[in-house]
């Protein structure tokens, strides 16, 4: 009797098909029964949204965008077209120029978006923080196997100062530094992210102050009262000169907000704290369950403003917000004798 040689494979295929359908059905039921993820922020946020403050905005996003918002409307927008990197630090100067560090370099542009100065990071190096000193100098840190601090003279195109920096791992460039800021005293506060500490350096590179328990230290700011504001992970805290915590914001203080990756935190003149919440820049954001990009918090930890703008306009992830409600001269700083 002639046997159908294909009957066995056919039967196996049929059984396999039933198994796949069954598994798919179970997966669908499981997905249906799985509880929905909690909202990343309240449906209605406190404050006036985009109209709460005038501000300059930039974030670590794939599209590398920056915005100026006034009166609740975007009045200026810029897209870095280099096609690589992320904007980790940016400052709007009093003359309208914008300085920004974008991982693979530092660039200064005019209000009409012309490049006034640029420095490209060498191969295998990264730059995530930069700050203007006056209108003619820039201080920045270059991550790499030989990490260094630089002060560049824009007019001459030369480096006026170069200083080696200590890191936890010279073979892991990306995680070494994210943020550093000059103080009124002319020292340089550096968040050593890969060493979980904050160090204050003078112009010679000498350590004048340090805090060693700053886990995932992302940003740092010296406050008018002499204390220091530190942010990183899901935590923001203010420490005194002895390193003691005198104020702290944790995830437990924000049960209605999914704040797990805080980047720059800034103490405002009114005493409130502005906290930027980063969202994965290579992912997509569901507008119906979108997190707040930034929140303003009172000293007693009440949220008085929440910014959520993922559509019309889509500001993208938030790393830095510079409020523009009052005139300021952010470039009015110095590093020791360098002014």
Feature map (PLM): residue ranges:
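Alpha-helical and His/Cys-centered functional microenvironments
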Residues: 6, 17-18, 32
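Bacterial N-terminal signal peptides
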Residues: 12-22
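Histidine-/acidic-rich catalytic cores in large beta-rich domains
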Residues: 29-339
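Sec/Tat signal peptide C-region and signal peptidase I cleavage site
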Residues: 25-26
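A general, composition-driven signal for non-globular sequence regions
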Residues: 2, 20-22, 42, 91
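Bacterial N-terminal signal peptides that target proteins for export
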Residues: 2-14
């Amino acid at each position: 009797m002639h046997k159908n040689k294909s009957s066995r494979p056919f039967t196996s295929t049929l059984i396999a098909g039933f198994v796949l359908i069954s598994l798919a059905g179970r997966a669908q039921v499981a997905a249906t029964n799985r509880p929905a993820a909690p909202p990343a922020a309240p449906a209605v946020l406190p404050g006036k949204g985009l109209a709460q403050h005038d501000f300059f905005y930039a974030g670590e996003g794939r599209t590398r965008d920056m915005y100026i918002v006034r009166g609740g409307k975007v009045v200026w927008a810029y897209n870095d077209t280099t096609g690589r990197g992320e904007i980790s630090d940016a400052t709007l100067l009093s003359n309208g120029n914008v300085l920004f560090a974008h991982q693979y370099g530092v660039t200064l542009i005019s209000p009409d978006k012309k490049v006034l100065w640029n420095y490209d990071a060498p191969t295998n190096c990264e730059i995530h923080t930069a700050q203007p000193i006056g209108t003619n100098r820039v201080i920045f840190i270059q991550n790499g196997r030989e990490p260094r601090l630089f002060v560049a003279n824009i007019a001459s195109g030369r480096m006026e100062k170069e200083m080696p920096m200590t890191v936890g791992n010279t073979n892991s460039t990306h995680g070494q530094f994210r943020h550093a800021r000059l103080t009124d005293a002319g020292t340089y506060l550096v968040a050593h992210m890969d060493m979980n500490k904050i160090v204050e350096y003078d112009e010679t590179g000498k350590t004048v102050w340090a805090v060693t328990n700053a886990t995932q230290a992302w940003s740092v700011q010296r406050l008018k009262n002499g204390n220091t504001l530190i942010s990183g992970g899901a935590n923001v805290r203010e420490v005194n000169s002895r390193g003691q915590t005198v104020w702290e914001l944790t995830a437990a203080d924000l049960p209605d907000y999914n704040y797990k990756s805080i980047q720059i935190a800034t103490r405002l003149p009114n005493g409130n704290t502005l906290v930027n919440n980063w969202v994965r820049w290579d992912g997509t954001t569901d507008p119906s369950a979108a997190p707040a990009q930034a929140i303003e918090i009172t000293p007693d930890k009440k949220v008085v403003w929440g910014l959520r703008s993922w559509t019309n306009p889509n500001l993208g992830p938030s790393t830095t917000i510079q409020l523009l409600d009052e005139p300021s001269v952010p470039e009015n700083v110095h590093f020791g004798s360098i002014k």
